[in-house]
Amino acid sequence: MSPRRRAFLASAAATGIAAFGRLRPLHAADAEIEIDPSQPGPTISPHVYGHFIEHLGGVVYDGIWVGRDSKVPNVGGIRQQFVDDMKRIGAPNLRWPGGCFADGYHWRDGIGAAGKRPRTYNYWEHRMPTGRHAVESNAFGIHEFMRLCRLVGAEPYVAANVGSGTPREFHDWMSYCNAPPGTLSLADERAANGDEEPFNVKYWGVGNESWGCGGNMTGGEYATEYRKFISQVPVYVRPFFVATGPRGHSADGDVGWTEGFFGGLQNVRGLGVRVDGFALHYYTDFRQTAEDGAKFDEKGWYAVLHKGAHIEQVIQDHWAIMGRFDPQHRTKLVIDEWGNWYRGGTELGPEYILSQTITLRDALHAAMTFDVFNRHADKIEMANVAQTINCLHSLFAAVGDRYTRTPAYYTFEMYRPHMGGRLVPVRIGLPQVTVPLLEGSGRLPALSGSASVRDRSVTVTLTNPSLRESVVTRIRLAGGARLREARATVLTHPDMRATNTFEKPDEVVPMALAAPVSGDTAALTIPRQAVVAASFHLA
């Protein structure tokens, strides 16, 4: 436990109040919040709290794969602390090997004896001036990836190569992964390489960003390729196919891609084309601004949260288009790349391309994003933060034997109770507020959140984006429910730019928050620039 957290808990125990100020009486509230656990809705897929790793910069090599002979504590070459922390948040899935890397990756290069694997070309490292892995060692292949998934307890999500691969290569990879022992020659080869039992990979991405790095196609052109790749696939495990979707952060939301792809599938009759998931990417993209991940002012704080919140509209827009072609909505959204993307300048080192400082702002952005995903549980099968370690909106930073959790990690930890819960209605009695942006102004919810129920426990998560004002809430459970007890944690810091470093790894960590209960009502004070998670146990 960090000294800061220990001191806080001692203070809270001694005074009976939160360190952010004494609670007002239950009847004196800034916001009335009503939650109705008697009206459970769709289940929140655990997979919306998913992860993404790629052969880029320090993500796989050094971040995760340190090598079997490394002095860094490891399990068969995989960083031990990474495994432990991923287990702690119940990481439900891992997407690999890309990203753009996937459409240049040929899976056979990553199997067999490590010393005999070919050294191959990594286009994305080569095109980066400071990339150090332009020559891909292939030390981390499908067997190492599956070992990582088993250690963590995560389900594999494999992105296949459409951009430079073939349907045959894809089908062989599926067979290599999933064919039972003693059936195909590919199953024998897998066993000879150390894994007799099948990997049982269910989730398969059919390419990645095929509108760009994955082939520079139109939606209609990709529809043709998609049909080829999923035809005559080996079905040892019923696959969940994820088709390449739009670049949702583009100016128009890239709605033309969605229309073109589903329209292209409609032109084919009688082939039974199945699309289980549709991959929407949404980056809160600030690469063209003067600010970076560490240096920002009030306008920069609000601009990132405001643009991040726009993902909700993008989800609704593409869902509506999908519904025109698929009225029953058999195809679900898979938001397999999301997160903040700043201009360079705060990398861990020149070779750690696309790494960036992760601050309290990024933790709140993640919280608001998760609440959007929860509220649209009927639409979203999976989501994957980009990326889990040493890249963009990362949960961890690692360089050699130095390692830390970022503030964003704790958002995942605090939201874990939502996984597999059923969404319940939550009404927050606060209007939106006007906030300054980098250009002009915009509107943000004064308080945003979501709620879920599981057994006799209700989880509510709330984010206060204000840099100035705390919010005192009175939370009432509707439907005749009564509270037995409540427990709450808060993630905040007096400095909006606060981050965790190798030297100060516990600067931004969750702390206990007072949550007094009376009958069907609880009180929470949400500090400024904070995210709160509360669990209410029903009588």
Per-segment meaning from a language model:
Residues 284-302:
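Active-site His/acidic residue clusters
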Residues 1-3, 14:
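N-terminal secretory signal peptides
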Residues 306-307:
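Beta-strand-rich domain onsets/edges
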Residues 9-21, 26-277, 311-312, 316-344, ...:
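Non-catalytic accessory regions flanking glycosidase/transglycosidase catalytic cores in CAZymes
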Residues 280:
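Histidine-centered catalytic micro-motifs
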